[in-house]
Regions:
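Beta-strand initiation motifs
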Residues: 1, 34-40, 78-86, 133-140, ...
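Structural signal for beta-propeller blades
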Residues: 25-29, 69-72, 123-125, 170-172
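Beta-rich, blade/repeat-based domains predominating
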Residues: 3-13, 45-57, 92-113, 144-162
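Structural recognition of the beta-propeller blade-terminating site
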Residues: 32-33, 74-75, 129, 175-176
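Conserved beta-strand positions in repeat-built beta-propeller and related beta-rich domains
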Residues: 19-23, 63-66, 117-120, 164-167
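Beta-propeller domains
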Residues: 1, 18-36
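Loop-centered beta-sheet repeat module
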Residues: 115-170
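Asp-box/WD-like beta-propeller blade repeats and closely related beta-sheet repeat scaffolds
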Residues: 38-106
Length: 180
């Protein structure tokens, strides 16, 4: 299997591999079988995605595009191929020199199956309801300390706690998560 300039990978429960990368001014997500045979490559003009995650329950794949400030949703077809479904583009900026525009850095599921994104450029977390078809509805936004630059979020496996890594001020926020 080959993906030019890969930056992040994720696996489905079936063992398919999804990789984000870029080639010749286009970025996207490539899909591969469990034995690493190429299935398809969904690309778009401009900067590549920086994060990919798989929602096996709804048969969706989520991507974060740092340079465009976007979260993207792809449908997982029965053979593992991807097709584009929906996207949301964040708005705003932050006080740090690296925060002139939105920079979506992470897109993954909460323990109760909502999609959450970290936006380094706007110092915010966005929470979305995701329909079975992959359509996004923004339902909440949480502001982090100005200039923090949220990058990645990890939920504790047993407690109602999430750990947020902030890149720009080199901190970790410990958040209480009681669901939506």
């Amino acid at each position: 299997a080959a993906e030019p300039n890969p930056t992040y990978i994720a696996f489905s429960e079936k063992g398919n591999l999804y990789s984000v990368g870029a080639e010749e001014g286009k970025g996207g997500i490539a899909s591969f079988t469990a034995d690493f045979q190429p299935l398809n490559h969904v690309v778009e003009e401009g900067a590549p995605l920086c994060y990919v995650s798989v929602d096996d329950k709804r048969q969706l794949v989520y991507g974060a595009n740092y340079h465009k400030g976007q979260v993207l949703v792809y449908q997982l077809e029965s053979d593992g191929r991807l097709s584009f479904v929906d996207q949301d583009t964040h708005q705003g900026s932050g006080p740090h020199a690296n925060q002139a525009s939105p920079h979506t850095h992470y897109a993954d599921l909460t323990p109760d199956q909502y999609l959450i994104t970290c936006d380094l450029g706007t110092d915010s977390l966005h929470v979305y309801d995701v329909s079975e078809e992959g359509k996004l509805t923004l339902i909440n936004q949480y502001q982090i300390a100005p200039g923090a630059g949220p990058r990645h979020l990890v939920f504790h496996p047993h407690y109602k706690t999430a750990y947020l890594i902030n890149e720009l001020n080199a901190t970790i926020d410990v958040l209480f998560y009681d669901g939506m």
